[in-house]
Amino acid sequence: MPTKLPLELEDEILLRVPPLSLTRFRTVCKRWNTLFNDQRFINNHLACVRPQFILRTEKDSKIYSIGINIDDSLEVRELNLETQGPNKKLKVYRNLFYCDGFLLCPALLDEVAVWNPWLRKQTKWIEPKRSRFNLYGLGYDNRRPEKCYKILGFGYGYSSEINGSYNRINPRVSVFEFETNAWKDLKFGLFDWHLRSPRTVLSLNGTLYWIAVRCESGGDGFIQSFDFSREMFEPFCLLPCKNDFGDTQILEVFRGDRLSVLEQCPTTNKIKIWVTKNKISGDRKELVSWRLLMTVSIPNFPRLQDLYSNSQPSYFMDNNDDKRLIVCTCDESGKPCIYIVKGDRFKKIQMGFEVEPWPFHLVYVPSLVPIPLA
């Protein structure tokens, strides 16, 4: 007669099963099906899952997940978003945004889909606003015990001062609430900062973060935030490095609870990875300090970002090795590839499938979190 495992050990094993396989286990027994709906198990599973990359092609609007196996081989899957919206066929043509395993997918006519690729038929369709937005972000009010997801729509134009220079941003801001299923407009005055790149907006503990630069201070860089609980933009902290011309500076989430910045010098191609010393709680009064996690100084190491391309690298640190850097970027010909870096060695891995040059990509952590569809 087979030996029954203790329930605690059974749960611990299931926490380490990849989401795609885990969703197939729902029918094994009633307890497992109930377990996969338990919020504590879902959150613990999200903390254990290995990050991967999501890549979106421009021409045919295809979306791929790219996982890195233990032996450094790539596991590539095409993710089939249900492309029939309520009124028309959806063509995802812009940047994707991530939160809690959800992908926010802006479409050609500003219709928006929020989608969990690992939970079949888990797509929420959102009607567009009249205003076109430069960027979106997905988060939630972190002061509430339950997560009430919200979407930020942020558009802007430049406003000229008396001297004729364009040194202020005139924002157009709206927030969509899943709870009310409606957009509402927010009013702000002129901003004295602009986004370094609208392609990189992070969601951490419900709050949005991105790199911004001051309009009038020679381009000083800092991290700007949007707090969904207060529906306010606020400067969060300074960058750990200077914002010199041509430098690559990429903001990512580290280990699910901290911020990380990758800096690459354009002349030496030397890389520094910085992480916040403490967990990011979202408290606007918290003091943020940085530590240097690793330095990469390898002869003939490539430049990760082309100076004249909008394509930015995305990266994460290996879950089991703080000194193992995994980067998704494009090579000098614009072809997407993966670099795995540790110590004084690096490995380049080609994707193995054909896409047009300079596709968009981002770091993604799969999850079992269901989308609130009501």
UniProtKB/Swiss-Prot annotation:
A Pfam family recorded for this sequence: F-box
Matches recorded under CDD domains: F-box_AtFBW1-like
InterPro entries: F-box-assoc_dom_typ1, F-box-assoc_interact_dom, F-box-like_dom_sf, F-box_dom, SCF_F-box_component
Gene3D superfamilies, alphabetized: 1.20.1280.50
Domain F-box: 1-45
Name of this chain's protein: Putative F-box protein At3g16590
Lineage: Eukaryota, Viridiplantae, Streptophyta, Embryophyta, Tracheophyta
